Amino acid sequence: MTSGANSSGSYLPSEIRSSKIDDNYLKELNEDLKLRKQELLEMLKPLEDKNNLLFQKLMSNLEEKQRSLQIMRQIMAGKGCEESSVMELLKEAEEMKQNLERKNKMLRKEMEMLWNKTFEAEELSDQQKAPQTKNKADLQDGKAPKSPSSPRKTESELEKSFAEKVKEIRKEKQQRKMEWVKYQEQNNILQNDFHGKVIELRIEALKNYQKANDLKLSLYLQQNFEPMQAFLNLPGSQGTMGITTMDRVTTGRNEHHVRILGTKIYTEQQGTKGSQLDNTGGRLFFLRSLPDEALKN
C-alpha cells in the first residue's frame, strides 16, 4: 500500500511539471499569435488609408472632368457644333465612373477578406487555448491525461496550419499589389485617351469657330461693300473718281472708310463744278471785253 501511494505521489508531480511546461508553451504561442495579428493589422491600416485617398482623388477628378465636359458642351452648343460628340464623351465619362466604383467595391471586398482572415487567426488562438483549459480541468478532477504528447502534436499542427495561412496571406497580398499596379496603369491609359479626345474636340471647335467667323466676314463684306462698288462703278462717273473709289473700296475695311470716300467724292464733284463755272464766267467776261469787229471776224 505504501509503495502504491509513493508511486502515485511521484506520478502527480511529473504530471504537474509537464502541464506547466505545456502551459508555458501555449502562452508563448498565444503571444506570438497576438504579435502576428498586430503586424497584420498594421499592414492593413496603410492599405485602407491608401484606398480611401485614391478613391477620394478619383472622385474629385471625375467631378472636375464632368464640369469641364459640361463647359465644353455649353461652348460647343453656343458655337453651333454638333452635340453628339459631347454626349459620347459624357457617356464614356459615366462608364469610367461606373468602372471605378466597381473596382472600389472589389477592393473593399478584398479588405473584408483580410479582416476575416485575422478573425480566423483569432479562432486558432482560441482553439489553442481549449486544450489548456481541458488539462487544467483534468488536473483539478485528479485525472491524468491519456497521452502527454498529444497537445504537442496539436500545437505543431496548429503552427503548421498557421504558417501555411500566413504564406497564403502573403501570396494574396502580392497578387493584390500586382492587380493594383495593373489597375493604375489601366486608369492612366483611360485618362490619357480621355484627355486626347477632349483636345481633339477643342481643336475641331476652334476650326468650326474660325470657319464661322470667315463666313460672317464674307457676308458682311458682300452686304456692305458690293452695293457701294456698284454705285461707284456707274457709267456717268468720271475716270478719276472711279479710280479713287475703287482704290478706297479695295483697301477699306469698314463703313467709316466708305463714308470718308463719299465725302471726298462729293467735294471733288463740287470742285469740278466750281472750276467749270469759273472757266465759263471768265470766257464770257473775255468775250464781252473784246470789240465788235473782233467778234465779227
Curated annotation (Swiss-Prot):
Residues 135-144, 152-161 have a biased composition (Basic and acidic residues). Residues 122-161 are annotated as: Disordered. It comes from the Eukaryota. Residues 83-117 form a coiled coil. The keyword Nucleotide-binding does not apply. Keywords: Coiled coil. This is Coiled-coil domain-containing protein 196. It comes from Homo sapiens. The lineage of its organism: Eukaryota, Metazoa, Chordata, Craniata, Vertebrata.
